[in-house]
C-alpha cells in the first residue's frame, strides 16, 4: 500500500521563498499539510504567494528577512513563531551567485556571496536550532528538521562560479557539523545539492548558445525542473527521515558522475 507524506501540524520556515526553488518548496510543503512561513526581503512577492497558498486551502504567513543582517534573522524567526507557532522544519534556501574568475573577485563580491550563502545560512539555522533545543530541554518532543540547500557546485568546482562553489562547499561541511552537534537534540540536519534546474531566474539562459552547449554536456542532455526536487524535500522534512542525519544528497540527474 502506498504512503504519502503528511506534514499536518508542522510549521515550516522557508527562506528565499519569493521566487525560484524557495517558492516551489513553500508550495510543496503547504500541499503536504504544513503551515508555511514565507521569508525574504521581497515581501510583496511573498504576499502574492501567500494568497495563492491560501486560495488552495493552505495556511501561510509572511515575514521580512534579510539573511545578511543578524538582527533581521533574530527578529524574523521570533516573528515567525509568534505568527505561526513553533518551527518544526527549516528550509534554508536563500542564495546568490556571481559569474567571474577568482582573479577578478573583489572584497565586495566575496562579502556579497558569502554573507548570504554561508554566513546567512549559518545564523538562520543557529537561531532556529537554539529555539528547537530550548523546547526539547523543556520536554517538548522533537523531531525537528533543518534542510540546507547547497549545490552540486559545492561538491565540484564549476567554471566561472568558483566563488559560489566555495560558499556552497562551506554549506556542505556546515551541514555535517550541525548534524553532529545537534542530532542529540532531535534535530536532523541534511543538505540537498541541486544540479542545473530551470527556474524563472535562469530560464532565458537555457535557450542561449552557452546554455545549449551546457545542456549538451549533461549526462541526459536536460536540465531539471523545480518539481524534480519535491520528493526529496518532502522526505527530509517528514518524520519518516528519522534515520537520515548529516547526509549530503545530490539531485542532479547524474551530473556529479560526468
Spans of features found by a protein language model:
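Substrate-binding pocket helix/loop in short-chain dehydrogenase/reductase
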Residues: 101-102, 109-114, 202, 214
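Short C-terminal tail/terminal secondary-structure segment
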Residues: 2-4, 156, 234, 245-258
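Residue(s) in the substrate-gating loop at a strand-loop-helix junction
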Residues: 151
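Conserved glycine-rich cofactor-binding loop
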Residues: 11, 18-19
Amino acid at each position: 500500500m502506498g504512503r504519502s507524506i503528511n506534514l499536518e501540524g508542522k510549521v515550516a520556515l522557508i527562506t528565499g521563498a519569493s521566487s525560484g526553488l524557495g517558492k516551489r518548496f513553500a508550495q510543496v510543503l503547504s500541499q503536504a499539510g504544513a503551515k508555511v512561513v514565507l521569508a525574504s526581503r521581497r515581501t510583496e512577492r511573498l504576499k502574492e504567494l501567500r494568497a495563492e497558498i491560501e486560495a488552495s486551502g493552505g495556511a501561510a504567513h509572511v515575514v521580512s528577512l534579510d539573511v545578511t543582517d543578524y538582527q533581521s534573522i533574530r527578529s524574523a524567526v521570533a516573528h515567525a513563531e509568534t505568527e505561526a507557532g513553533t518551527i518544526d522544519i527549516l528550509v534554508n534556501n536563500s542564495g546568490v551567485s556571481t559569474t567571474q574568475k577568482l582573479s577578478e573577485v573583489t572584497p565586495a563580491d566575496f562579502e556579497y556571496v558569502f554573507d548570504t550563502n554561508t554566513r546567512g545560512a549559518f545564523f538562520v539555522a543557529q537561531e532556529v536550532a537554539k529555539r528547537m533545543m530550548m523546547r526539547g530541554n523543556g520536554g517538548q518532543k522533537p523531531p525537528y528538521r533543518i534542510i540546507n540547500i547547497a549545490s552540486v557546485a559545492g561538491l565540484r568546482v564549476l567554471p566561472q562560479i568558483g566563488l559560489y562553489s566555495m560558499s556552497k562547499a562551506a554549506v556542505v561541511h556546515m551541514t555535517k557539523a550541525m548534524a553532529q552537534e545537534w542530532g542529540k537534540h532531535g534535530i536532523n540536519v541534511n543538505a540537498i545539492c541541486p544540479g542545473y534546474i530551470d527556474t524563472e531566474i535562469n530560464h532565458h539562459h537555457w535557450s542561449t548558445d552557452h546554455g545549449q552547449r551546457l545542456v549538451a554536456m549533461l549526462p541526459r542532455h536536460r536540465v531539471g525542473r523545480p518539481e524534480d526536487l519535491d520528493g526529496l524535500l518532502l522526505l527530509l522534512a517528514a518524520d519518516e527521515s528519522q534515520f537520515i542525519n548529516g547526509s549530503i544528497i545530490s539531485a542532479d540527474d547524474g551530473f556529479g558522475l560526468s
